[in-house]
């Protein structure tokens, strides 16, 4: 008898969940997965919320699934269309398409009170009118349920008093287009050309749209931020040190820089619990950024600085959409000419004088709009962008909410006791006592990508179902450090989370084990490489024959691109420091245990 598994959503998480369940079916667990997707194609948010010129800011090396890679010749960062092509090829290669049911909207999920099985009810899109749904309700019975609907579901619109006045003042203009909308409705530059544009939110989408507006020929662009952001380029190659420019052909993706050894592998529980690795990393990076770019706020970031207690990778999601920074920095950049001759960050020529002197103005969120459509900004004395905007008459013709999304699980029957991702207390994947429901893809890394995390989460969930997860699970130390008042609490450190899941399921390789099985080359790659999912398929229950080849070629390339100096600064030095720190901790732990202490 098959064990039916229903997967809701055919984005990257749903696809990898389906593929992994198929591959790990056995006599005892004959998984028979199907995927229900309410849209007419796969891809999820990458398909239906994309726009012209949009690219992934996570690298192909990290984003691609562990055993289905792009060619070495492919650019490091994919356009959204390229990524959708990749997902289609993935589904075809692993024969998932026959298991994906498109145009199926899940309307109710309840439990059979006698068997505990999940009853998943859905309707299909009407053939006569694709905007409507058929009345016929179809119900399937499943032993397992994977919820893969994603983090980006319902657009969020923070309330701003008087925003309707922008609409009223623009409605008299014929053919002017929509004047207030969410970022998911933005599709191309024609929506911004020759307009006064205001963008609310400084996440990656917000800053990307600010750049798009500048390049579209907008008359004015105002980018509004609540509390600032931390800007870093998605690849490192635009530096000049003592007149020597970095090699433009050897770009290093930012998400491939964090090393494994002693940062995520062989970390003592005391060190892990203290997060000292994150704090030391932040301390060093701030000083290096000051030396190279003149500011600690971010990489070549002269405005929009976060509060000191939130400035660092331990606290926030890095904003890797860096293209707008030359336009934002222009009124604020003030660096000593002598220091600039020692080291500097090189802005792209096409975004610099004499090609352009356009400015994107940074401002606080408006407190309200006047009846004439003018935005009123609060005075924040500690913020230089706020001081600069005081007295400015800003009357946007277009306001874009780049304010993120919330999640909704209206299909869960209220009387059936289903959890939500916030209540998934087993590694943010399942709730204790209800392991048959897995939430895949509901965490977001500070630096990294959700698709490879979804792959590791699926491996963990399958191991959990089969009773193959280590017990008891150690306490989690992978969450970003956020305050209780923060809206988003699902942030994780990519490397720490991936490594934790790998250890939980017996997929984290040992150094001696790696050398014995695969030799020095793979061992060095593991030590100096980032937390790629492929590393966790060298040993353990999800071992893959393709993993060593991927590591010896593609992942090795990310290490050699750094060069000798880069591997010293980003590899040997931090590795030596953390190894020393962990060695002392293990030594102290032995003494502590000898005298009867217990280490969690």
Can you describe what each PLM-predicted range is?
Residues 57:
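Extracytoplasmic catalytic/substrate-binding loops of multi-pass membrane glycan-assembly enzymes
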Residues 64-67:
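Catalytic cores of eukaryotic secretory-pathway lumenal/extracellular enzymes that build
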Residues 1-53, 69-483, 494-600:
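Flavin (primarily FAD) cofactor-binding/catalytic cores of flavoenzymes
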């Amino acid at each position: 008898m098959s064990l039916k598994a229903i997967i809701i959503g055919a984005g990257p998480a749903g696809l990898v969940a389906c593929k992994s369940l198929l591959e790990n079916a056995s006599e005892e667990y004959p998984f028979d997965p199907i995927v229900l997707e309410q849209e007419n194609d796969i891809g999820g948010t990458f398909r239906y919320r994309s726009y012209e010129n949009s690219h992934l800011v996570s690298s192909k090396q990290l984003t691609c699934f562990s055993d289905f890679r792009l060619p070495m010749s492919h650019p490091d960062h994919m356009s959204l269309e390229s990524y959708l092509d990749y997902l289609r090829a993935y589904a075809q290669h692993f024969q998932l398409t026959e298991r994906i049911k498109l145009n199926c909207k899940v309307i109710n999920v309840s439990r059979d009170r006698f068997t505990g099985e999940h009853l998943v009810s859905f309707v299909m899109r009407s053939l006569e009118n694709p905007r409507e749904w058929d009345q016929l309700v179809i119900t399937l019975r499943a032993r397992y349920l994977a919820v893969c609907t994603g983090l980006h579901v319902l657009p969020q619109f923070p309330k701003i008093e008087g925003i309707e006045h922008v609409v009223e003042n623009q409605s008299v203009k014929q053919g002017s287009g929509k004047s207030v909308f969410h970022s998911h409705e933005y599709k191309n530059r024609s929506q911004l050309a020759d307009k006064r544009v205001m963008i609310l939110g400084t996440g990656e989408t917000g800053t990307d749209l600010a750049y798009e507006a500048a390049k579209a020929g907008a008359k004015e662009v105002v980018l509004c931020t609540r509390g600032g952001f931390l800007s870093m380029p998605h690849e490192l190659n635009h530096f000049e040190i003592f007149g020597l420019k970095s090699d433009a052909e050897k770009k290093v993706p930012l998400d491939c820089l964090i090393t494994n050894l002693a940062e995520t592998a062989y970390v003592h529980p005391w060190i892990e619990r203290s997060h000292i690795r994150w704090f030391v990393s932040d301390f060093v990076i701030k000083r290096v950024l000051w030396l190279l770019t003149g500011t600690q706020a971010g990489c070549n970031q002269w405005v929009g600085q976060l509060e000191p207690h939130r400035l660092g990778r331990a606290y926030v999601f890095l904003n890797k959409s860096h293209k707008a920074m030359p336009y934002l920095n222009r009124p604020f950049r003030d660096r000593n000419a002598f220091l600039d001759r020692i080291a500097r960050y090189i802005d792209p020529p096409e975004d610099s004088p004499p090609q352009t002197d356009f400015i994107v103005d940074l401002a606080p969120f408006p407190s309200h709009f006047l009846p004439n459509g003018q935005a009123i900004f609060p005075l924040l004395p500690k913020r230089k962008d706020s001081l600069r905007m005081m007295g400015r008459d800003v009357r946007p013709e277009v306001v874009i909410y780049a304010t993120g999304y919330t999640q909704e699980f209206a299909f869960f029957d209220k009387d059936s006791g289903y959890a939500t991702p916030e209540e998934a207390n087993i590694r943010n994947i399942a709730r204790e006592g209800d392991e048959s429901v897995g939430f895949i893809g509901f965490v977001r890394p500070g630096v990294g990508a959700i698709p490879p995390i979804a792959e590791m989460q699926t491996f963990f969930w399958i191991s959990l179902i089969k009773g193959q997860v280590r017990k008891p699970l150690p306490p989690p130390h992978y969450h970003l450090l956020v305050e209780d008042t923060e809206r988003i609490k699902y942030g994780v450190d990519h490397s720490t989370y991936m490594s934790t899941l790998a250890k939980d399921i017996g997929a984290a390789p040992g150094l001696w084990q790696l050398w014995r099985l695969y030799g020095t080359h793979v061992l060095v790659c593991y030590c100096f490489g980032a937390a790629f999912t492929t590393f966790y398929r060298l040993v353990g229950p999800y071992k893959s024959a393709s993993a060593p080849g991927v590591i010896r070629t593609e992942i090795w390339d990310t290490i050699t691109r750094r060069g000798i100096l880069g591997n010293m600064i980003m590899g040997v030095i931090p590795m030596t420091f953390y190894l020393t720190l962990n060695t002392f901790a293990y030594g102290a732990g032995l003494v502590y245990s000898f005298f009867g202490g217990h280490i969690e």
